[in-house]
Amino acid sequence: MSTAAAITRRNFLRISALTPLAAATSSKAFAPIQRTGGPFFTPTLNAYSFLEQLNANLADPTKGIDLFGVVDFCVKNNILAVDLTGYFFPGYPKAPADSYLNRIKRYTHDRGITISGTGVKNDFTTADKAVRAEGVTLTKLWIEVAARLGAPVVRVFAGPQQKNPKDWQGAAGGASRDEVEKWMADSLRECAEHGGKFGVIVAVQNHGDFISTGPEHISLLKRIDHEWCGALVDTGKYFTDDPYADIAVMVPHAVNWQVKETLGSSLKTPRTDFKTLAKIIHDGGYRGFVPIETLAMGRKDYNPAAEVEMVLKGMREAIAALD
């Protein structure tokens, strides 16, 4: 066992010890996902990697790239699935026209690409009940959009991303963490209940906000306690001394992923060790798509196509080495 692996294992055991009640007292709704057949996963794409180009196209259709262009990128690189972030659909936050949904569904199908998910912008951290209610309404709407697309997952946030993970306290109006988690869980449970009616899972992302550690992620999911709610594991947003340990704790609850090129979504943090990450995902028994989401991180020369291809190569090689 390598030194890094040994450290991660020790921290995994430490983090697991912090959440004993999650395993001991919750209902059957909150439990490790029952997967059969052994681990089997492949790196895919989250469209957000092309953020700047997609936004440019929304502002001026003659510029940048649209979602159809993102699908073409998947074809070029033999990527089997794409997570089509809601923000990049025309008219967001409104539901796209049926004609547009039908076009993108047919376009992906004809090219052998699966639409693996979508996502919205919401704020369930705020003390403002009206804003939370708007987030529930938005999430429910996009659950229905996801169902139309044939996408099994809608990604949601705990709240808006903060420069400092502790800044959520300001948005929460001074409420305690327990109180915020309660009202957040109430909102997410309502969304998950709606998701169950449409066969769409609500995936809560750790986004460097209210959810910045594995134990925080587990605690919220336990409180939501709904079979149609799970974790979107963002490998670049567990702000701890050993993010790999947090990732390992979350694999049994993962319903979607965002694989980042660095561990802290910043050029100041270590590059992701894809071999370590792949082994953690494998050892956790995960089956399914593992979308890559790269970030500009302030780089003026950021090339999303090249960055995604770099991470894709690293993940594919790491997975192949597991055999």
How does the language model describe each region?
Residues 2-153, 170, 175-182, 226, ...:
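N-terminal pre-domain/capping segments
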Residues 45-46, 156, 253-261, 292:
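Non-cysteine beta-strand/loop elements that form the S-adenosyl-L-methionine
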Residues 82, 181, 185-280:
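Acidic/histidine-rich catalytic cores of soluble enzymes
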Residues 113, 200, 284-288:
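A short helix->loop->beta-strand "cap" motif at the edges of active sites that frequently abuts
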Residues 146-170, 198-207:
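Active-site groove signature of glycoside hydrolases
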Residues 275, 282, 289-293:
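H/E-rich (His + Asp/Glu) clusters that bind or coordinate divalent metals
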